[in-house]
Regions:
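Extreme N-terminal basic, low-complexity initiation segments
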Residues: 2-6
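Short, Lys/Arg-enriched N-terminal segments with co-localized hydrophobic residues
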Residues: 16-34
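Surface-exposed extracytoplasmic segments
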Residues: 34-374
């Protein structure tokens, strides 16, 4: 996240029809908010197709489900439909706490036809090749957007959906501002009973990958860590990572001022997260809980939070009920109230979002592809 990922909340303001070509500030609930999901190059800055909004990992029907959402239309009428035909969309899987991924599922798309449909291909890369860009990998299946494709215990669907994410963005403003400034969080004027879902009626492009429990590496009981990335072909013939994300809400909370989308976290491998950002993030969390009086050991709490969130890889035990909640962070379902959990974590106290999973019940399904196509 983000990627927003990724990241929703980064896209704060945007009921006013912003163009994704502009990274200027907008005002929500009386304060300025940056539109801060990563824009890493001039080309990326013009293309929401590369912006990761969310990633989900959960148990399906005797399977593991991986979902990556990109290209939210909350950025306005200039959003380009579909997936970028010169990009790669990758799910990265680590096993048993390993530093590097040894399984990558890579999804690519061709240019859209007259009906807006795109040919899609899924490749799998294993071992050391899973973290490299040059290997082609094994072609698993080929299909078209808007239609399910399957082969060898793997199913893939990609297309436009109703966005299942939910948050009242005015609450975000009350938390990420203090995190940035190291001041106390003041929720005295926050009224959870009046919360509204800022993402109601919005749409995203979604990639849904379902892998059978018969997969030799993804059998029940296997401990995995998952993150996703978008990559864009370069003029030199290589690939540049544009966005990536594991845990939800990372950019909206910790890097809300990344208005030019040049934060090095965009292109960094998760294995470098703690070294690059651990001290900085721990200090900010410590300052917030110290000012808010929610911890007797602010420095220790800040370090504890960072140790939980870095590397930015979402943990999951294959075959178990997924939940991104207060009891555990084990994968993430479409219903989970991830913003409430993440905001509470950095605040050091419970933050009531005022929203329940039922607010977006109509934006998710019980069967493959588990999302609601539009």
């Amino acid at each position: 996240m983000t990627p927003r990922y990724a990241i929703k909340a980064d896209l704060s303001m945007l009921h006013q029809g912003l163009s994704s070509q502009h990274a200027d500030n907008r005002r929500i609930a009386g304060r300025e908010f940056p539109m801060s999901h990563h824009l890493d190059t001039p080309l990326a800055a013009q293309n929401g197709q590369l912006f990761i909004d969310d990633m989900y990992v959960f148990s399906g029907n005797d399977s593991t489900v991986f979902i990556m959402d990109v290209n939210s239309n909350i950025t306005g009428v200039h959003v380009q439909p579909g997936f970028h035909h010169e990009a790669r969309y990758e799910f990265k899987v680590h096993f048993d706490g390993a530093e590097f991924e040894t399984l990558t599922y890579r999804v690519s798309f061709e240019q859209a036809d007259a009906q807006g449909r795109q040919v899609m291909k899924l490749h799998a890369l294993t071992g050391k090749e899973a973290r490299e860009d040059s290997p082609a990998g094994e072609l698993v299946l080929e299909g078209r957007t808007g239609e399910a494709a399957s082969a060898g215990g793997v199913r893939l669907w990609a297309g436009r959906i109703a966005d299942p994410f939910y948050i009242d963005l005015s609450l975000l403003a009350k938390v990420n501002g203090p995190v940035n400034s190291g001041t106390a969080i003041d929720l005295s004027d926050w009224q959870p009973e009046n919360a509204k879902n800022s993402f109601a009626g919005t749409k995203v492009e979604s990639i849904v990958l379902e892998v059978s429990h018969q997969h030799p590496q993804l059998k029940p009981g296997t401990r995995i860590g998952v993150w996703c990335a978008t990559k864009l072909a370069t003029d030199a013939g290589g690939w540049r990572q544009i966005n990536r994300g594991g845990y939800p809400m990372m950019w909206p909370i910790f890097w809300p001022d990344d208005t030019h989308f040049t934060n090095s976290a965009n292109t960094r491998h998760p294995s470098k997260d703690f070294e690059a950002e651990g001290k900085h993030i721990a200090e900010h969390v410590a300052a917030v809980v110290a000012a808010s009086g929610t911890s007797d050991d602010p420095k220790g709490y800040g370090l504890t939070v960072v140790r939980q969130l870095f590397p930015d890889i979402l943990p999951y035990v294959v075959g178990t009920p997924a939940t991104f909640g207060f009891a555990a962070r084990n994968g993430r379902t479409l219903a989970d109230n991830a913003p409430e959990v993440m905001l509470s974590l950095v605040a050091g106290t419970g933050v009531n979002s005022g929203l329940k999973p039922s607010i977006a019940e109509g934006q998710r399904g019980k069967n493959f592809p588990y999302v609601v196509p539009m």
